[in-house]
Amino acid sequence: MLASAPRDSKSAPRIVPALIAMSALQALVACAIFAPGVMAPRIGIAPATLGAYATAACVVAFFFTFAGGQFAGRYGSFRVASFCAVIVFATMGIAAWSGASPWLAIAGVVLGLAYGPETPASSTILFRITPPAKRPLVFSLRQTGNQSGGIIGSLALPYLAAIDPLYGYVAIMLLALLALGAFELLRPRYDPLVRGTGSGVALRDALRILATNAAMRKLAIASLPFSALQIALNVFLVSYGVTQLGLDLVQAGLLLAIAQAGGLVGRLSFGLIASRFLPAWTTVVALGFGMSLCAGVVALATPGWSWALLLAVAFLFGVTASGWNGVFLAEVARLSPEGRVGEATGAVLMFGFAGLVVGPLLMAGIAASSSLSVAYAALGLMTLLATLVLIRAPVKDSPPA
């Protein structure tokens, strides 16, 4: 079984190196996910092809997210991280070869092998080495990797794509190699803490956690539209800015970078709030209402809006739609049965990845028949309905530390 956080601070591994490494892993995967979307206007990737890439990644991730907890328990969290870095390297190579062709979906399939396992594997080691009072903040800090990757990609990739679209993919491949080396250096120190805890756990046993825990079921249900709206922000905002708001590629990339910066601020702020001031459950509910409202405002945006207003809306959209993950995962870990954080996280995230599958499909489908504005409004409504399910807190809410 997975023990609680070590009490002996002298013998316990330091939290900071593991936290930085696992955040870097998420940033690397995020760069790989965002790359085709950010460079789409330059390369000429159609929304349908872009949606196929994101959907393929999320479908595969849906099936492999539970395996992340198992693999971390069997081989170690950093061994899984190394595997994910290799997968990102391969994905970018395939994407570079595919260009704007439908073969880009194959790159998405490969990326899903990293996208699914990385979060449960990270949760397993961070839960193991982090004191309970610090978990909301630590998990939120870890989730800032998504924003860090998004900001770097949104700012750097458009300029690289202006020179040659291949340069963006090659840059991410080089980062993957650097990450692989770092993960292998840290692996001997951290992996023995969790190795041997994940074998023999069946998917049905992990899903039984949801069947017997009403609070976990609610979180699983909410993670579907929450994730759908988040990926809609990350994958389609650049295309939305260019095609419907009249922005050029660099401006649209900056808009996404501002949204990612908002997500970074949100994850840090809400992690601190849930650690010290409000219960994590209440914080998640507030974020659900906030992202629903922001999606509606984005749907109303027009080319006549000022640049400052667009930046402000993008920032707030990022604060909410990309700021919920850390507090959410900390609450999942808190509600998990003793020793089963990885499996429980994987079980809940299967619903989240279902949302990541549904999101691009809905966005592409609605955009084809109507517009991206209507698509954002539809996902905002879905998120609002899911948030209403969360209003009633669990019997044992998580008090601020």
Residue ranges and their predicted role:
Residues 2-12, 190-220:
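Juxtamembrane intracellular "pre-TM" segments in multi-pass secondary transporters
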Residues 65-76, 266-279:
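Helix-to-loop junctions at the C-terminal end of transmembrane segments
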Residues 74-85, 275-289:
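Cytoplasmic membrane-interface "Motif A"-like loop-to-helix N-cap segments
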Residues 107-146:
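Cytoplasmic helix-loop-helix junction between adjacent transmembrane helices
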Residues 281-328:
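C-terminal transmembrane helical hairpin of 12-TM major facilitator-type secondary transporters
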Residues 63-99:
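Conserved MFS/SLC helix-loop-helix module at the cytosolic interface between two early adjacent transmembrane helices
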